[in-house]
């Protein structure tokens, strides 16, 4: 089993590291080992803007998915306890977004954000006698449009994680709080949130890594434009390798993504409660 894991997971990572020290391309032969690719790629004038777009996209997605996922999970759990109608429908509706492929999700949101005469959101704005919005062509608005689409897609995953964590909380904690006269908001902030700390941090690690690697929905929705307003690092890697045929440059950026992912994972993990604190 270890050998199989090594072949299918470890070897590609090692090979990406190796390629980052070469001048390999998709159409060239006999690459030579050099450090110039690393320096040229990291000194690219486009890289700072792309990293900033990535920070906005990943940071906004993590915060939005965490908050909305927790909100939906709380509503579902409380609805189940009270036997409210529509709880199952809400849970199923949230999960639908998760199973929709990224390309399909991008197309759906492209139709919603379309600036054509019959674009869904702009049609609603016209009915309300409000000015239409350049959802995808304005460099200041397009990143937020991509962010909304990604939050919609990823909220379901956070909801599943938070739902499982909420169901595992000992009900006696709430019973004791009721006896002590704690309000609903006090129970939420002093019982629910502390009990969810580990689940929230693990969820943040997972959705950060998933969002950092997201490019399918963006390439369908905006193609990285207008300009480079929505070109995150994962899409930049795709463009470098498959449009510029620069395999070594893409490898350097892939290693950079790996370092960022591991760094953020270690930061999140450092806040996980120790066993004696649980």
Task: Set out the residue ranges of the language-model regions.
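A structural signal for multi-pass alpha-helical bundles of membrane permease subunits
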Residues: 1-278
């Amino acid at each position: 089993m270890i050998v199989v894991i090594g072949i299918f997971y470890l070897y590609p990572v090692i090979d990406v590291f190796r390629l980052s020290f070469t001048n390999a391309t998709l159409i060239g032969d006999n690459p030579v080992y050099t450090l110039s690719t690393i320096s040229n790629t990291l000194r690219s004038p486009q890289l700072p803007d792309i990293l900033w777009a990535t920070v906005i996209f990943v940071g906004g997605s993590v915060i939005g998915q965490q908050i909305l996922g927790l909100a939906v999970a709380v509503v579902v759990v409380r609805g189940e306890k009270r036997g409210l109608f529509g709880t199952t429908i809400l849970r199923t509706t949230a999960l639908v977004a998760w199973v929709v492929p990224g390309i399909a999700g991008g197309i759906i949101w492209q139709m919603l954000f379309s600036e054509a005469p019959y674009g869904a959101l702009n049609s609603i704005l016209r009915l309300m006698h409000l000015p239409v919005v350049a959802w995808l062509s304005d460099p200041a608005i397009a990143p937020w449009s991509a962010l909304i689409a990604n939050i919609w897609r990823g909220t379901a995953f956070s909801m599943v994680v938070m739902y499982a964590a909420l169901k595992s909380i000992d009900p006696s904690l709430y019973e004791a709080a009721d006896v002590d006269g704690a309000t609903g908001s006090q129970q939420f902030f002093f019982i629910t949130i502390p009990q969810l700390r580990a689940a929230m941090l693990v969820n943040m690690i997972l959705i950060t890594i998933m969002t950092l690697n997201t490019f399918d929905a963006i390439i369908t929705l905006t193609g990285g434009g207008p300009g480079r307003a929505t070109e995150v690092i994962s899409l930049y890697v795709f463009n470098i390798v498959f449009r510029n045929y620069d395999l070594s440059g893409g490898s350097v950026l892939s290693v950079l993504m790996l370092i960022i992912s591991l760094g953020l994972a270690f930061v999140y993990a450092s806040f996980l409660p120790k066993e004696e604190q649980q």
